Amino acid sequence: MASEAPQFEPKIVAFVCNWCTYTGADLAGTSRLQMAPNVRVVRLPCTGRIDPLFIVKAFERGADGVIVSGCHPADCHYTAGNYHARRRFAIFRDLLDFMGVDVRRITFSWVSASEGGKWRDVVNDTTARVKELGPFTEYQGLSDPWPPAPPPTGEGASSSQALGTP
Amino acid sequence: MNELRELARKLLGDGTVKVVIGYEEGPRGVRPAMITDPAQAERLVFDARCVHNLATYLNPRRPHLARLGKPAVVVKGCDARAVAGMIRESQVKREDVVIVGVRCGGVVRDPTMKAALAPETVSPRCGHCASREPKLFDHLLGALPPAPPRPAGDDPVARVEQMPLPERWAFWKEELSRCVRCHACREVCPMCFCAACVADKSRPQWIETSSTPRANLSWQLTRVMHMAGRCAGCGECTRACPSHIPLSLILAHVARHVERRFGYQVDDDPSIPAPIGAFKTDDSQEFIL
């Protein structure tokens, strides 16, 4: 068997609302729609429950992309949760952009319980987009408390290199 | 200034208030002062060195000040926005505070500087100030001084906005790598009044307490999100920051974005609801599929 270079498979976390998108994703599954297997679904009561910190935490823990999805406007199970979320994410998306995060890694969408096909498209589009962007090494590399020390020079340099300590 | 001392003496003398929160001359420039004795009202000063946002002393996180009794607080136009914010969010009752507004001609960057205003010394927030006269007050003092000079140099927020994305990331990574997570930006802020902060939560720990660039970014993203549409723009977080991180840039950028998007400017009218916590059914949603 010819060995191929391992292709980058992005980790994508989807924060979805219980009432629309989760049910829509369920419909996509029961309808046997084929879609990229890169998405991990986190079910929440409502998009209004999704704190921007969830997205930050997902990136911190190694996600390469994030999907946030819930009920269409006027369809919220709790009447107004998605309207609040819409304002919040309009600001948060712009804030991330200002801080230098590529917002193409985050997809916001409204997917209703009957839109299994739309969910498939959201998943496939996001996966393809993030695949193209590559791993989110910028964010994941932030976990190092200090920038790597410059390579040692002069006396004792070789011994410390041999020990693997910077 | 005499007007201010006169008023403080009167308010304390007739028992309207128990403490006047104002400014006094300190060993290193001007500093906040809590005057409880009418005879001490002479200590009060007001000039271009009065940088501090005294509204922060009304913050319910400071119960030791509340124990002194009903306060009167000296506010500039920008500080009045913070008082209005606390009234809007039910942290302070309007009738529980006497607001002494002062007409302001701009302040310097640091209270230890000389009171002379020049493009190099003027606080960046004063450059385009449209609220040198507070609209929320019980007493309004002084005559309106001439407008402050524009700060030297170009607009720093626009400069960061115009950077290409990777450069912006590198810029903030570098700036935030200096953060020591002392949370002075939170402590000094009049609008940060949660009894328990998410940054102090350990189970689950949403924001790491160590000062790694990753945790620092989490912290600032969270803080700024909580400030969106609420920040009075007083710049105290930047002044309090021991690592000189330009936090005001982020807050100013978000404030501009909120204004562009929702047509909302933080104002000193407590009856106007803030954009987060309110919504319109036809808010634009071009970024949502």
Regions of interest found by a model, annotated:
Chain B
Residues 1-172, 190:
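Iron-sulfur-associated redox domains of electron-transfer enzymes in respiratory
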Residues 73-76, 179, 240:
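Active-site-adjacent beta-strand anchor residues
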Residues 79, 185, 237:
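A generic "binding-loop/recognition-motif" signal
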Residues 87-90, 179, 257:
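Alpha-helix boundary/capping residues
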Residues 129, 182, 234:
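Short Cys/His-rich metal-coordination motifs, predominantly Zn2+-binding knuckles/fingers
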Residues 151-177, 191-289:
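Ferredoxin-type iron-sulfur electron-transfer modules in oxidoreductases and energy-metabolism complexes
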Residues 182-190:
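Oxyanion-binding "anion nests"
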